[in-house]
Regions:
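An extended, acidic, His-containing surface patch that forms the Zn2+-binding/catalytic region
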Residues: 80-81, 138-217, 225-238, 246, ...
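Short, solvent-exposed loop/turn segments at the edges of secondary structure
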Residues: 36, 67, 89-95, 191-193, ...
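Flexible glycine/proline-rich, aromatic-decorated loop/lid segments
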Residues: 85-101, 313-316
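Acidic/histidine-rich catalytic neighborhood of metal-dependent amide-processing enzymes
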Residues: 6, 11-89, 355
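A generic structural motif
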Residues: 13, 104-106, 224-232
Length: 355
């Protein structure tokens, strides 16, 4: 459904438009008679499931793909639609299921309460091992990195440009306060610090179906976002060790990892390429392009960086306020997508000129 300036559709901005935008940017150069380098497009459709199919294909087509000068990924965006945004860093991801079992069948809570510990209370004890409940700070040292001073400087610059819109974009209840005291602290926390989210639960009946029963088990799906530079496999191993050691009350406790992905930190773009993006942005928007970070995870970015260590990386896109990616009213911002198409054309042409 198109209702300007939006194109509505599940998967539209995250990120079904990417292949079309890339193809159109090359077509524009061909129609204008502008030389361009060889462009190879990889369209993979399991990114939301961890990109497990991608490594075998990269390996199988190593000779055909060669060593790219630049890898372009359109799965990002920024805090407004006025600028062209380039993502310099992405957080990684560690997730798994924390299971606590205390009995083989449900027991009357009046008869057992006070003698058998609740599996939910044991979950709370275990969660306190990895997160400070009052602040949300993740307490696993291996999930933290030293935050460079330039990150704080860039966060202040972003604050000055976008102001409170970063917080205001979220559909929170009116009385909710943000975790951080300042906007720049919030920007850094969203991108360069680890966070824990409980994203699912089993063993809990609905409120309507709940009875006076001490339940056998509580299972929680834990999702840790980790900053770039953290080894995700080591981090998930440490999480498992911390959560499973010395189970409270001798309960059966297991943490079963199901996904891990490293974060990403892009190397600087070459001068001519950076200049081409800047010129295109100024021509199209009247504003310079801006670098930002994304607290989310694109698993294949670190994977591609490991495969092509000498390549430049341009991670960009038109995700922004109100697009509601993964939501029922997900939508693509058409004007900024058109501008990005032209900017990408200019970038591709600049690569050809400097080969």
């Amino acid at each position: 459904v198109r209702r300007d300036p939006w194109l509505y559709g599940r998967g539209s901005v995250d990120d079904g438009y990417g292949g079309y935008l890339c193809a159109t940017s090359v077509r524009l150069l061909q129609e204008a008679g502008t030389p361009h380098p060889r462009c190879t497009m990889i369209i993979e459709t399991c990114e939301e499931s961890g990109s497990f199919d991608l490594p075998p294909y990269l390996e199988a087509f190593t000779e055909r793909l060669g060593n790219p000068d630049m890898v372009v990924v359109l799965d990002s965006g920024g805090p407004d639609y006025d600028h062209i945004w380039m993502t310099e860093a992405l957080r990684g991801l560690v997730s798994g299921t924390l299971s606590v079992k205390v009995s083989h069948e449900g027991i009357h809570s009046g008869n057992s309460g006070g003698s058998i510990p609740s599996s939910f209370r044991i979950q709370r004890i275990l969660l306190d091992r990895v997160e400070e409940a009052s602040s949300g700070k993740v307490t696993i040292p291996e999930m933290h990195v030293e935050i460079p001073e330039e990150v704080w400087e860039n966060a202040i610059s972003l604050r000055d440009i976008v102001g409170d819109s970063i917080w205001e974009q979220f559909p929170t209840v009116e009385t909710l306060r943000q975790v951080s005291e300042t906007t720049e602290e919030m920007i850094v926390a969203m991108n360069w610090e680890p966070t824990l989210s409980v994203i699912g639960a089993d063993g809990l009946p609905s409120v309507q179906d709940a009875g006076n029963v001490l339940r056998t088990n509580t299972d929680l799906k834990l999702s840790f976002r980790i900053p770039p530079g953290v080894d995700s496999e080591y981090a998930v191993a440490r999480a498992k060790e911390i959560l499973e050691q010395d189970p409270p009350y001798g309960a059966e406790v297991t943490f079963t990892p199901d996904s891990c992905a490293d974060g990403f930190h892009a190397p600087p773009l070459d001068g001519p390429i950076s200049e081409a993006i800047n010129e295109a942005s100024m021509e199209l928007t009247g504003l310079p392009p801006l670098a930002t970070w994304t607290g989310g995870t694109i698993p294949f970015m670190a994977m591609m960086q490991g495969k092509y260590p000498e390549a430049m990386f341009l991670c960009t896109g038109t995700s922004g306020p109100g697009n509601n990616a993964h939501g029922p009213d997900e939508k693509l911002h058409i004007p900024s997508s058109k501008r990005l198409t032209v900017a990408l054309s200019a970038t591709i042409a600049a690569i050809s000129e400097n080969l």
